[in-house]
Amino acid sequence: MKNSQKTVTVKFNADASTGQANLQVDTAVQKVANGKDAFTLTATVEDKNGNPVPGTLVTFNLPRGVKPLTGDNVWVKANDEGKAELQVVSVTAGTYEITASAGNDQPSDAQTITFVADKATATVSGIEVIGNYALADGKAKQTYKVTVTDANNNLLKDSEVTLTASPASLNLEPNGTATTNEQGQAIFTATTTVAATYTLTAQVSQNNGQVSTKTAEAKFVADDKNAVLAASSDVTSLVADGVQTATMTVTLFSANNPVGGNVWVDIEAPEGVTEKGYQFLPSKNDHFVSGKITRTFSTSKPGVYTFTFNALTYGGYEMKPVTVTITAVDADTAKGEEAMK
């Protein structure tokens, strides 16, 4: 046969044994660590001559905290273009390194992906009170650290936290809102001149319009070291008839704050007068609850009575004693003076 020709088709396959995976990640800078928002990983497999290697099994090397969107399989077969894809998610915020490997078992260059906390589920997880029982002197400070996390306990940065206090006599700085830092904490400080137990309420908004709140207690106490004991009587003299009374008021305050403590009185009666000759009610010893006590005095024995009040604060500070003097006038003398008017 003259001029006979025959065509033969020859197929060259890529060298799968030299297949090298090159890893790429979608262009998203970060995803939310909610177990749903996924990065797409694409591994392209080529042999040493740059030919795509379809059908090669690609292994995506995922670190702890990162997993496939569906199932647990990290092995994906490359398509006709030598590409394998895997979507991955996380519930733990952080930056992770991922590699892929194929036929030659050599890992690709590492790519990083970042998952961030989920603002949609922002929650006030705690309020730390530092410096509790500070003095209510307008200078001593307390610090409040409000921690915000998401539904998966990831610390939330850049969340606006509102803090209020009741009663409202607490001076907060900043007054209203603070933004959480890298540790998920919004930090406030406070001073006051009003000793009280304050209820702190922290609030953070979620994307669905809901809010998360949490409360804590903080106590400012009176400065009992600088407390002042005072005593007075509604009268300076009375008739020694056993009926008329004098009412004495005794106070223990630091600035405008009541101070707790024990109080007792020493009574100096006229010569010859025993305790049976007068009444001091209800008792000579007591304790301050709200910074104030009252006592009544009456007598049937004339003369000058001196009452010396002493106090010891619950903090262990002894106060400077104060005195009240009352003159009891003989009943007959009082009647004569009244008749002469």
Task: Name these PLM-found stretches.
Residues M1-K341:
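The feature marks long extracellular or luminal low-complexity segments
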